[in-house]
Structure formats: structure tokens, C-alpha cells
Amino acid sequence: MWIALLGIPILLAVLTLLLKHINKTYFILSLTKRVRTEDGSPLESKVAIMPGKTRFGNNLDILNFTPASVFNFVRESTAKAKGQNYLWYFLYAPMYNVVRPEEAEEVFQSTKLITKNVVYELIRPFLGDGLLISTDHKWHSRRKALTPAFHFNVLQSFLGIFKEECKKFLNVLEKNLDAELELNQVIPPFTLNNICETALGVKLDDMSEGNEYRKAIHAIEEVLIQRVCNPLMYYNWYFFVYGDYRKHLQNLRIVHDFSSRIIERKRQQFQQKQLGEVDEFGRKQRYAMLDTLLAAEADGQIDHQGICDEVNTFMFEGYDTTSTCLIFTLLMLALHEDVQKKCYEEVENLPEDSDDISMFQFNKLVYLECVIKESLRMFPSVPFIGRQCVEETVVNGMVMPKDTQISIHIYDIMRDPRHFPKPDLFQPDRFLPENTVNRHPFAYVPFSAGQRNCIGQKFAILEMKVLLAAVIRNFKLLPATQLEDLTFENGIVLRTQENIKVKLSKRVK
């Protein structure tokens, strides 16, 4: 009997040693394999490991968070890491958070790390297999097919539409002189109209239809955050029972019906004209995005669902992200009178009649472009992007288990004081050519980087230049909102809880 009793402590000791050994390789309470260094050195020498609120890793750290508290939690985690990249351990998978451009470079440049992470799976019902989410052959073939739709000559053909929409926008501003103008209300219709008429080739005349689309987009984003902040919500069955599933379906139906009507309208126009035509010099004409997709459909390279996915992706990315940047840029111009004055002096050199301003002249607005870039640095429209290890992969000298989630924190990378001294100050001069010479090539990545960078970034910059030049030339911007009054929120794009407001006064010429 006493021999049996003596054996119990020995058995417990053996089990303890066994568990310790297993725990070096596996985070048992998170049911996931641990990250380890390739050379066997301590993991803490390469990455900070964020302690969780419980013994179950970081699984319960963001439970029932709001978009605002998610934003603050990520900023606090970055501050605790003290300039290091850091690890979270969630159920079934670690998450590697990259906040330094040096390590982000390897992720961006990797040919293995092109699969988006699990958060994007929650967006799939909205965007399908569009460029943002698709991978492998589908992504490569679609990217190759769509690249010509953003060629210089195509962008040049959009200039007239941008100018026309700007005139309508200026008329809206004229009606709001000396009043507080809510930028969140007036900017999105402008960018949505531009997307529909340029890239999609359909004029959006029914503004109420556009308003319904924008409201549905915001509702979809709220559901996304609800699911991100509750690990159980990642499971569709749980979301169906306890989440806003039916409301989500209704909003998906609104946005998909909206894009489908646009596609059908364009398909009818497309069938009435001869594609493959040549211009007066005998060169094959280039077409905007939806024309390109319809031509590919006619050649059997893409089906109707594929067109819907790409249109939904580009409408969302092109309208919402550009709106966000324009809103923050106008706010920063209102808050910094000296910067606004320099921009005004630059745009004053443009021809009197906006119809006479060429693409070349817009490209010469160097300081205005610096202002746009600095706004994007401080307030990136997309504050983070995600990747996933589809197999065990070595990243930055660490062995990442299969299914490791990688989050590249664009917001924090572009506020790294080593590359942007006094990062919380608005200083457009950072982007003057002479000040960018020695900067790390991946320190400024508002449009992502590497092979999965944003296909429409030149489109966005031109669109913003045209609008900002027109506004600055005709109106003086005065602040009605202060930065310290804003509560930032993490979503698919960066948002604030409060509407951002400015005041306008007419410039006397």
C-alpha cells in the first residue's frame, strides 16, 4: 500500500516534467503551437510576448470590445512592446504583430505570405474572391488583367469626370458658407460618384440609392468588429444564433444589389459597342475597370460572380478609403493655416479655368502631394493589413507554425520615431524629395507594399489632388473640430466616433 502511495508523487512529478516539456512547444491552454526562433536563441530577444489577462493566452483580452476600445488596445499593446514587434496567442493560432518597417519588409516581399489572414474571411461574404481576398492563380490572373485599367492614359481620361464632380461638390460647399460643415456627410457621395463614373463607367444619378449603399457599408463594418471582438463569433453557427446575422444578410443584399444594378447597366452599354477598337494611331484602346472585366467575361476568362466580386471590392476600397483620407486632409489643412497657405500659393499657379488644367500640371503640385502623404501617414485609411502562414514558415528569424496570423500595423509603422521624428506632429515637409532620400523604403506604406500593393493608388492620389486643389483655391478652411476631441475606431478603415467638421469662408480674388 505504502509503495502505491509513494508512486503517486513520482507520477505527478513525471507528469509535471512532461507538461513543462510539451508547454515549450505548445501553448496548451490556447491549443496552439508556439513560435520559436530559428537559431534556438530566446524568443524574447526577437519579439515581445504580450501577457494575457488570463492563463488562456490573449483569447479574452478583447472580448466584447467596441471599435474604439480595439483601437486603444492595439495602441497600448504597441506602447508596451517598446518598439518591438510582439506576439499574441489566440485559440488555435499565434498572431505576430509587426510594427517595424525592417521586419514588415520581409513579410511584404515574401512570395509565400500572400494569403490574407482569418479576419478577411469575415469580409468574404461581402467582397467574395475579389483582389483584396483572393490568392494564388486567381489573384495573379485578375491582377494582371486589371492592371491596364489603371494605366496613365486611362487615368488621364478620368480627369474630366473628376473636374465635373468637383464643380458639383463646390456648389454644395457654396451653400454651407460660414456654417459648420460635416465632412463625413459631404465627402463620401463625391468619392462614390467618382468611382461609379470612372472605374465602372456608370453615372450615379440616384443619390438616395447611394445613401442606402453607404449606410449598409457602415452596418457591415459594425458586424465585422462585433465578430472580431468575440472569438466565438468567428464560428458561423454561433454568429447565426447570437449575432446580428439577419441584419447582416439584409445589408449584404443592399450592397450586392447596388453593384449588380451597376454591372447590368454597364453590360447593356458594353454590348452596344465594339470592343477591341483602335484609336486614331492604330493602337488598341485601353478600358476602365468594368469594361476590362466585361471584355474578359466575353473571352471566357471570368464569370459573372467574378465580376461582382471585383466590382464590390473596388467600389468599397475606392470609395471608403479615399473618403477617409480626404476628410482627414481637409481637417489638417483647417488646423494648420501655414500649410494651407503654402498649398494655396501652389494651386494659384494653375490655369484660371479648371477645364484647362492638365494631368501634367496636377502632377506638379508637389507640396499638395506632400500634404496628402502626411495625412495618410498620420491617419492611414487602412490601419492594418493581415497575412497568414499556410505552412510552417520562417519569418524574421522565427519559425511560425502553420496558421499563424500576421498583422502588419500600418498605423504604428508610419509613426515609428526612428523614421519619422516627432511622429504626432503634422509636417508635410517630411515628404519633400530631399527629406526622403535615406528613409527606409517600407517606413511609408499607406497603400501596402510588395506584389499585393493597392492597384488603385495613382487613381486615388489624382482624385484627391483634383478635389483638394479646387477646394483650397475657392475656400479658406477654418477648424471646427480639434484632434483631441476625436475618438478613433478600428474598422475595415480608420474612423472616428464623431463627425469631423470644418468652417468655410469664400476666398476673395
Swiss-Prot record:
InterPro entries noted in UniProt: Cyt_P450, Cyt_P450_CS, Cyt_P450_E_grp-I, Cyt_P450_sf, Cytochrome_P450_Monoox
Gene3D superfamilies, A to Z: Cytochrome P450
Cofactor(s) recorded in Swiss-Prot or TrEMBL: heme
Repeat keyword on record: no
Uppermost EC category: oxidoreductase
EC number: 1.14.-.-
Residues that hold heme according to the record: 317, 454
Entry membrane topology: Peripheral membrane protein
Gene Ontology cellular component annotations, sorted alphabetically: endoplasmic reticulum membrane
Keywords: Endoplasmic reticulum, Heme, Iron, Membrane, Metal-binding, Microsome, Monooxygenase, Oxidoreductase
Repressor among keywords: no
Source organism superkingdom: Eukaryota
Subcellular localization, as worded in the UniProt entry: Endoplasmic reticulum membrane; Microsome membrane
CDD domains xref list: CYP4 (cd20628)
GO MF annotations in UniProt: heme binding; iron ion binding; monooxygenase activity; oxidoreductase activity, acting on paired donors, with incorporation or reduction of molecular oxygen
Entries under Pfam families matching the protein: p450
Family membership: Belongs to the cytochrome P450 family.
PANTHER family per record: CYTOCHROME P450 4P1-RELATED, CYTOCHROME P450 FAMILY 4
Function noted in UniProt: May be involved in the metabolism of insect hormones and in the breakdown of synthetic insecticides.
Protein name: Probable cytochrome P450 4ac1
Organism of provenance: Drosophila melanogaster
